[in-house]
């Protein structure tokens, strides 16, 4: 069983990932981490990795380093969770990505850093005032979608998802009341430890589903649904 002190340790993963602790606090966290149960230590490491990878995604999407204010937004998003004592290693990326989206909306990084070009789909989504974030497990890794109904688009980030077997592809499906519509495929060479893709024309879809399909994909899902992320 995970003890309350373990939850308290996990709550420190986000500020630790953002180097928002003093040297003394960092040493104390690392001491507690070395004595923590293996599952707790693994969850701590996963949250640290997720926060840092999400920050890297934003830097790549906007061609700029996230500003100091964005770091503060991340810390502020993590703060309320401390009173809830829930297993934040499963929800950390929600708060992190949502805070990033809020930060980008406030600071307009895409526009400021690319004045001579139209914002990319990723920049538009991340800067949208209605941006939402969902995340779930996919093939042993994590799939996170940041999406905007105003922009009718989304950004998919897959971390540590193993590539599909040779001769198959991951296929994404936008599902609405009429059924699934293909949102693209990813073959073995397209899937890396951190894979990014854009989703366009969300329409009235309420779910993003993932299946494994043969060859270069299918017109309708034929494989087992690996994951479903609600787009609500």
Curated annotation (Swiss-Prot):
TM spans (from-to):
92-112
Q: Which residues lie on this side of the membrane: Cytoplasmic?
A: 1-91
Single GO MF descriptor: sigma factor antagonist activity
Going by the UniProt record, its keywords in alphabetical order are: Cell membrane, Membrane, Transcription, Transcription regulation, Transmembrane, Transmembrane helix
Per the record, its GO cellular-component terms are: plasma membrane
Q: Which cysteines are joined by disulfide bonds?
A: none
Give the subcellular location. Answer: Cell membrane
Q: From its record, what is one biological process in GO terms?
A: regulation of translation
Q: How does it sit in the membrane?
A: Single-pass membrane protein
Where are the Extracellular topological domains?
Answer: 113-232
Main function: An anti-sigma factor for extracytoplasmic function (ECF) sigma factor SigK. ECF sigma factors are held in an inactive form by an anti-sigma factor until released by regulated intramembrane proteolysis (RIP). RIP occurs when an extracytoplasmic signal triggers a concerted proteolytic cascade to transmit information and elicit cellular responses.
Q: Which family does it belong to?
A: Belongs to the anti-sigma-K factor family.
Q: State what protein this is by name.
A: Anti-sigma-K factor RskA
Q: Which organism is it from?
A: Mycobacterium ulcerans (strain Agy99)
